[in-house]
Regions:
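Short helix-coil junctions and helix-kink-helix linkers
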Residues: 21-31
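Short capping segments at the starts of secondary-structure elements
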Residues: 10-19
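Short, cationic-aromatic polyanion-contact patches
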Residues: 1, 49-59
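Glycine-centered, phosphate/nucleic-acid-interacting loop/turn motifs that mediate DNA/RNA or nucleotide
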Residues: 45
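Short, hydrophobic-biased segments on the C-terminal half of alpha helices
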Residues: 35-39
Length: 59
């Protein structure tokens, strides 16, 4: 289970979804749970997504 605190700690620099997945849960091949968490965090304004580079950042 991926937690918000772990995601925020992994976002020490802007990262793409797949590289975040490799840092947080490399054994899980599906990015669905992480993507769902990132979207909820984006709604809460904790993270931002740069559409041009495809990377997630801390807000």
């Amino acid at each position: 289970m991926i937690r918000e605190e772990d995601v925020l700690a992994a976002l020490d620099k802007p990262r793409a979804l797949y590289s975040l997945q490799q840092l947080l849960d490399p054994s899980n091949k599906s990015t669905d749970a992480l993507q769902d968490l990132l979207l909820r965090m984006r709604t809460a304004k904790k993270v931002t997504f740069d559409i041009k580079s495809g990377r997630w950042n801390k807000a």
